Structures are given as structure tokens and as C-alpha cells.
């Protein structure tokens, strides 16, 4: 396990995966890999990039008055009281960054936010403003596209890792019993509900993988 603050953070399989790179870390959903990445870049860098991908903000859909902006925490948020405490009494602690790095505890996102972020990875770096339609539409106005300042090599690396998730990783079961399935890229997500509780899980994907 890896210790941050007073807590020991383990791999979800209790054994670890040895030395792996980014793509395989996505494929096997390695917690300890991303603990180290998150701790290395820091909370405020994670917060900054998350804003680029549409988190911590409304999506722009026509029913935005019913949206929740969610939460991707920052050191300033902790310093100001975490939304419930007194300013200066709830500073950022090392345990926060570990949990944040795998999307837990101080991270709360909505389905439409995660869909926008994955769409931006799929389309090469454009954040799309979703809107409601009555029928299929072929054209998308440029006004609904925002180019994100993210290195194209990093986008390709993420796409490759997401494809591996479905080919041989935690999302491989999507292939079972389905014929003529186009290439799918995606990622599992799991949140625990206390000791003994059932996990909450979802799977986010896009297809075809290379278009």
C-alpha cells in the first residue's frame, strides 16, 4: 500500500500490478498508479484541468437550472471551509489527494459532465455543449464547440488506454454475447458505500474508438 497522511491506500486487488504504464493503469484500473500521478501533479493542477473538461460548471444544456455543477475540489475550497466548516479550520490534507486522484471523496460529477469529458477525448479535444433535439441531426454548430488546451499526444494516450479497458481490462465483459459490436473505448467507475455496502458502478464509453 501507499501511505498518505495517516492512511494506507491499497490497490483494489490487494496484490498490485507491478510496474505498468499509463495505458495499462487505465486497463486494469490501478488505484495506486493514479494515487502517485495525482500526488505528483497536485490538487490544483487536477482542478484546473477538470475545469477545462467541463467539470465544476454547468454544461450549457437548456435545462441547466436543474443541473448540479458537482465538485472537483481545490486547495482554496478546503481553505475556505469545504462548504460546511469554518475558513482556515479544514485545510487540505494528503489523504484528500489520494482519494481525489481516483475520482472519490472530494470529487462529485454528473452523468452529463462525464459524457462531455469523454466526448472531448473522443473527438480530439473539443468540449461540446449538449442540447435537446426532437430528431436525429447531422450538423453541429461551431458555436457549441470549445477547443481545449490539452496536448494531442495526451489525448491519444488516453484513447489508447480506454480501448485497452474494453479489449482486455475491467470493461471486457461488454463484448460478451454481443455480435457485430464496433470498437468501443471506455472506463469503469466504482464508488464504495461504506463497509459491507454494495458498490455503485458505471461504465462510460464511446464508439467507434477511432472516429
Q: How should these model regions be labeled?
A:
Residues 1-211:
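Beta-lactam-recognizing serine transpeptidase/beta-lactamase-like catalytic domain environment
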Amino acid at each position: 500500500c501507499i501511505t498518505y497522511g495517516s492512511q494506507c491506500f491499497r490497490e483494489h486487488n490487494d496484490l498490485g500490478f507491478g510496474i505498468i504504464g499509463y495505458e495499462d493503469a487505465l486497463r486494469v484500473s490501478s488505484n495506486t498508479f493514479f494515487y502517485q500521478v495525482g500526488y505528483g501533479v497536485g490538487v490544483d493542477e487536477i482542478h484546473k484541468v477538470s475545469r477545462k473538461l467541463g467539470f465544476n460548471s454547468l454544461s450549457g444544456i437548456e435545462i441547466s437550472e436543474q443541473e448540479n455543477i458537482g465538485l472537483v475540489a481545490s486547495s482554496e475550497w478546503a481553505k475556505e471551509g469545504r462548504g460546511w466548516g469554518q475558513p482556515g479550520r479544514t485545510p487540505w490534507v494528503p489523504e484528500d489527494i489520494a482519494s481525489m486522484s481516483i475520482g472519490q471523496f472530494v470529487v462529485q460529477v454528473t452523468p452529463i459532465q462525464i459524457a462531455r469529458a469523454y466526448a472531448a477525448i473522443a473527438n480530439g479535444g473539443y468540449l461540446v455543449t449538449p442540447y435537446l433535439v426532437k430528431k436525429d441531426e447531422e450538423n453541429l454548430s461551431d458555436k457549441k464547440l470549445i477547443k481545449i488546451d490539452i496536448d494531442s499526444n495526451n489525448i491519444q494516450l488516453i484513447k489508447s488506454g480506454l480501448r485497452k479497458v474494453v479489449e482486455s481490462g475491467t470493461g471486457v465483459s461488454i463484448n460478451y454475447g454481443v455480435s457485430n459490436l464496433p470498437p468501443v473505448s471506455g472506463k469503469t467507475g466504482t464508488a464504495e458505500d461504506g463497509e459491507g455496502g454494495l458498490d455503485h458502478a458505471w461504465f462510460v464509453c464511446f464508439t467507434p474508438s477511432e472516429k
